[in-house]
Amino acid sequence: MSSDSSRTIPVDTHVQAFPRQISSEAGDEEVVLHLDTGQYHGLEGVGAFVWRLVREGATVGELESAIRREYEVEPDRCRDDLQTLLAELHERKLVEFHNEPPR
């Protein structure tokens, strides 16, 4: 997926785990079960790192900053890869985007 501006998720967008899922750490991996579809999703590496932050609640900008602190990655590459990951998680109904922090 390209990261053209029509698909860019703003940095102040709050990312929240979809309520109808459960997840668990399995070593360095996160395993997510979507309760409506019964599908399991495995996240490794940076994906698992992002998922742990999403479970706690974070904005796109906070996620990007945390990735850059934890991993050695160029800013543009970080931004593009994060946008792609979040779009994929949203498409699979594993995350939701909100303008305000979740309550």
Where are these predicted regions, by residue range?
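Short alpha-helical segments that sit at the start of domains
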Residues: 24-47
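Long, charge-rich, low-complexity alpha-helical segments
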Residues: 3, 7, 39-103
